[in-house]
Amino acid sequence: MTAGSTGLLDRLRTAGIDPGDSDEQRLNKSLLMFATGLASVASMLWLVIYWSLGPQLSSTLPFAFQILLAVNLAVYIKWGNFDFFRVSQLSLFLFFPFVVQWSIGNFISASGITIWGLLAPVGAILFMGTRESFAWFAAYLFLLAMSGFFDFHLASAEMQTKQQIPIRTAVVFFALNFAAVSTIVFLLLRFATIEKQKAQERLNEAHRMLQIEQERS
């Protein structure tokens, strides 16, 4: 990776961070920027594989997801409203997978794409806190239950009206969706843990220097 690309990544990761932000606020902002980047890369990979397999379905919604992520990110970088950015990004993570599933057909034909919605409550834990994350998880479960309810009761009608996805294509995207979400969650947790360890090391170093100064005085 070149110095220019590394500098760009660093600027994106620290975008919106103010000098007066606490360590926790800095971590929350960095995590959400990291999550946005991971989701963008994963959805781009999703589109590339989608086009290579050539299913007869529109890729408008997945492409629109990328556009919305980018626009929301640009708005945040320009105006710096982290609360709006946080809620709007998590809302995209939560609702968009279900919209895509409903447009395709059902849980099976959409290859379990609703698993992407799990990024919203997981992200809420990391970016907001445990108490705030409960509402996001409840919303995810509600959408999942509602989708399952309608899939169960409208299964026969959907089989007749919705275009069928080749089984091999469905299997590929089942694996891709679960692998992508699992990877994003793992990388986010790993990043959060590393950053917290760095913060603890800085705190320990500051405490050590303070003790040295006290011993000298």
Residues of each region from the PLM?
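Membrane-interface elements of multi-pass transporters and channels
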Residues: 19, 55-56, 79-82, 106-107, ...
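Alpha-helical transmembrane segments and their immediate juxtamembrane flanks
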Residues: 85-86, 95-98, 146-198
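Membrane-water interface at the C-terminal end of transmembrane alpha helices
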Residues: 125-136, 185-194
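Hydrophobic transmembrane alpha-helices and their membrane-interface boundaries in multi-pass
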Residues: 34-109, 113-123, 140-145
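N-terminal membrane topogenic signal
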Residues: 23-36
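Amphipathic alpha-helical coiled-coil "transmission" helices that mediate dimerization
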Residues: 186-187, 191-194, 198-216
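The cytoplasmic-loop to transmembrane-helix boundary for the fourth helix
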Residues: 128-150
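Non-catalytic regulatory/interaction regions at protein termini and inter-domain linkers
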Residues: 1-25, 56, 155-160
